[in-house]
Structures are given as C-alpha cells and as structure tokens.
C-alpha cells in the first residue's frame, strides 16, 4: 500500500483539522494508499512526524495556511491545499497527492503494520458520541504511527459502531485500549491484555497513553469468560471510574428513548391537538403516534437509564436487575431520580454478589443466567418497594410541582444556573450534570429546563461566530476563518465548537460565554418555553409542537448570542496587527 505524508496546519481551526484528517484517511484507504498525518494547531501538535520520516520525505501534502514548519522537509516536493478544499473533496486531494508521488516514494515511510511493530486495537466513545469520540480515535492513530505500531480503532459514536474490530484483529492484538467516558461492552476481549482510560489522555498525549497501556494492561476476564460471569474487568483499576461515569453511561443509552418518544408525542399533538391521546381519538394516526411515543418510548426511558447505569458498574449481569428496578421506580412514580437510585443499587449489588458468591467451576455458568439476575432483581426490587420508592416519589412530586409553578425570580434563577453550567466547561462534567438533570425531567413531563439547557448550549459557538464577524479586531485570521464551522456546530447544539476559542484565552472567553448562556437560559425559563426533545438544535424547531412559545424561545437564543458577542468585545483585548 502506497504511503504519503500530510501536514494539516490548522491554527485555530482544530475541529476542522480533525475532520479533514479523518476524511483524508478514509479517502486514502479507499484509493489503496496510507497516509501519515500530523495536525498542527494552536492547541499543540497531534501525531508529530518522527525525524527519520521528515528527513526522508520526497512528497508532502500541506493542508491549511498556518505554519507547517516546512523547513524540516528539505528538498521534498510540497503540495499545498486549503482546509476547505480537502473537506469538500478529500478524494480529489488524495488523487492530487498520488499524481505528484513517484512510485519509489513508498520507501519514504515505514508502514506501522511492519513485522516489528506492536499490534494494538482500541475503542473510543463518549456520552454523546460526537466530538471526543473521534478526536480520541485520531489521537491514538497518530500516536501509533509515531511509535511504529499497528493500530485499529473502533469508534462507538452517536450513530453506532464504525470501523468495527474483527475477531482476527482482536486475536492478533498485543493489547486492547478502551479510551471511553462511558462503559463499553468488553465481552469480545476475554483473555486479552486490556487497559481502560478516558478520552482526554488519548486526545492530549496519545503516545504516553499507548506506552502506559503496554506497560500496565491487565488480562481481562480470564481465558474463556462464561457469558459475562466474570464481568468485572481486572483492568478496571487502570482508570478512575466513579458515579459520574456510570451515570453518563445510563444517560447516553436513555437519550434515544427520550428523543423518539418526545418527537412522536409532538407530532401527535401537531396532527390531533393536545387531546390526541384520549380514547375518543382511538384508531387515528395521532392517537397511534401518542401511544408509541408516550406509552412505549417514554415508558422505557427510566428502565433504560437504570439498566445501563447497572451495566456500567456490573457489566451484563447488571442489566436485568437494573432495568427491572427502573421499571419498579417508574411504576412507583419515582421517575428518573428513582431510576438513578435503582441503577446504582442494582449495579453495586450485582457486582458485590458476583465478587463474593463462589461456586464450583462446573456451576459457575449459573451465575450470569440465574443467580445474579434473580438475587440482584430481588435486592433492587425490595429496596425500591420498601425503602427508597415512596420517599423518592414524594421528592420528585415536590420538585415537579415546584418547577411547574416557577414564575418570576425563581424561574429566572434556575435559568441563569442551568445556562451558566452549560457554558462553563462545554461538554465537561458541569455541562453534563445540567444536561442530565434537564433530560431526566422529561420523564416527569417537565420540559422547561430542557429548553433552557439546549438554548444555553447553542449560545457559545453562535456567540463566538457572531463576535468574529462583528468585532474582527478581537480575533486572529485563523479564528475568523473557523467561525463558520463554529456557527454550524452551535446550530446543531454541539457546544464543543467553542472549545478552541476558549482554550486560547480562557480567562476572558469563558466568562463571556457563561454570561451569554445564562441570559439565554433565564429568558427561556421566564418565558415558559418547553422542549420535548433532548437534542437537535435549531433543526428541532421545525417540528410542530416540539417547542412551545417558539418566538420567545428564538428571542432567548438571539439575545443570548448577542450578549455573548458583546461580552467578548468587552473582555477580549484587540489582536495586534489585525484591522477591524
């Protein structure tokens, strides 16, 4: 397979750089070529090219107009393309590179799959499965090439698994790396050396993560795991896990139920009015949509949340007790709070049972299919029925009544709080805490916090985009060039689009973003806007009845964006040599 060198000099456009790298890699694979890609941005260098590779390079593709340090390539032939050209047609970029590359140029690089290299497989995943999933995959792939190892990465994103690992690749691997912020299924890796980490180490320092994995990985699940009986990985201690990660796993699996149920209910109301679910309309399309959304989709929300919290803690044996406990919580009107408690009781309870119940080897197979599900379900079911169910139901009823009765200053304060949290760390723990709280309340038919959270999450990238267009002297050329991409991400409710700007000047940028998002959230809550879907950004506004008080909701977004832009103008200093 022919191999080529690519340097993406992105400046502030780090998000577009990662997308361009992935597009080039896929296009090169389709064309029967391999590419070694280095990404250079204001956040650092990802996948730095080793000296022996740069010294022997004959042809190099330079993407972008920032500094690519081309002096290190000596007399190599350089082909320059813009980021936009590569994103628009990566196949054409690969073809242009191939046309300038002599047949002998393949000797300039050494394929990481050579006989002397380690074989590594990895899985990357994050709670929402959008940004960090693919950035972590990119970091691992670049790091493996730098170290001379063969790397295959399976991404478990929002649309499911991509580039799935084969059984042959897993068998041949020297180590398995799980770079994920939520739990993933490890059943395939029984008997393999396995190392678990979050996505951030893979993004920030892939080579160090790979070296640590090779040195510290432990054998997962024994040589032949029995249907998840030994579900708790010995490698689990390699990375810090905790309640937050388990909760985010549950939320991640719950979101599709919330989205499907909420939008189908909104469509039912659009077709048949607010009484579409009444028996008087039985047999109509609107009534059917309401039954599917409310009686099926929403009914499974809390069991899915609880089941996958338990799965994150205890692996497969925890799913059945968790889901049953979640359904018990829902039937007791304990809602998402009860589901969270049921999930943790089931997860930690099953994990403890699995650890302390010892059976003869020939009876070990009974644990995952009989003993753990029955005892785990008994534990969580009785705990919810007699201990936690009613108190949590009373607490949720009070919280629901309080939220529904919010007016004036109370709604304003909650909107300010949720909005500020959404912008504080843009996809981090504080952001996810506000998002999980708002999403969970949908199960109790409380939709105003969800509306506030989404409008606040859209505000930072859109506010930055507006500021780069209006207050040009506060931003570099590279920052202004990536503003369109940030704006598109904002429209899609991907708050992470603002991260490159915040990383460059956090002390001035983050306060401006928090102010704008807090204002947007406060206006949304005060206006009583409701949102029945947990995601979708500006595009969900096109669905009838998905958002109430639509004009006020759009006003909240516009005001929040403008406030963000003005705050950036006031807080950021002019950039030298930039004309407004």
Swiss-Prot record:
Function, in words: The phosphoenolpyruvate-dependent sugar phosphotransferase system (sugar PTS), a major carbohydrate active transport system, catalyzes the phosphorylation of incoming sugar substrates concomitantly with their translocation across the cell membrane. The enzyme II FruAB PTS system is involved in fructose transport.
Membrane found in the keyword field: yes
Matching Pfam families: PTS_IIB
Positions where Phosphocysteine occurs in the chain: 126
Membrane topology: Multi-pass membrane protein
Domain PTS EIIC type-2: 243-580
Enzyme Commission number, as recorded: 2.7.1.202
Record's protein name: PTS system fructose-specific EIIB'BC component
